[in-house]
């Protein structure tokens, strides 16, 4: 017998080498990106009009290391050719102070998204991903179920699950395809503030690569017209 598990979705988690320094540097500028929580802006700061954390000079080394992980993910894990430059297009805060969770969503305008875990108290919210294929569910709607006697699957694993969650520890960065649906889920007993820097990365071809029929050519060749 042979079994082939094909077309996996790959999520990457890597350790940031100077986390203590990066954490201090961020808390020094945290006040610039803090936001008033309301019904719209509670778990993320993306929509408050200041998604520009990556432009802070004191955080340059932090984001350079994030891009180092992005390059490892792209070149060593996904095995792309070394033909890309990497652009951080926007960055914002993901913050949880209570049981509120981030609903299912994706980042349609980017290639790779990252979450850098700056502060993670015990029982911090977990990061969940949705299976984009569902082929091993055999039919849609075959969910995990709330009651044992209504579950059809004996053991949930990476082969048959419709969702998958991870708990990246503080000082680590998680990378995943931006179009992969993801969310967060609270854990009972959580106290404190889970804080992460979230960002989107676009892969653009290096300036010498103009022969490809797909992908973004280097922005130095773009011409922007005022709207």
Name each region found by the language model:
Residues 128, 201-227:
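Double-stranded beta-helix
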Residues 37-38, 134-143, 217-227:
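Short, cationic low-complexity segments
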Residues 118, 180, 201-203:
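Short beta-strand segments enriched in hydrophobic/aromatic residues
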Residues 180-186:
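Low-complexity, intrinsically disordered Gly/Pro/Thr-rich segments
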Residues 175-179:
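Short, proline-centered helix/strand-breaking motifs
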Residues 87-94:
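A short glycine-rich, His/Asp/Glu-containing loop-to-beta-strand
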Residues 97-173, 185, 193, 197, ...:
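Catalytic core of non-heme Fe(II) oxygenases with the double-stranded beta-helix
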Residues 1-82, 94, 99-101:
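Non-heme Fe(II)/2-oxoglutarate
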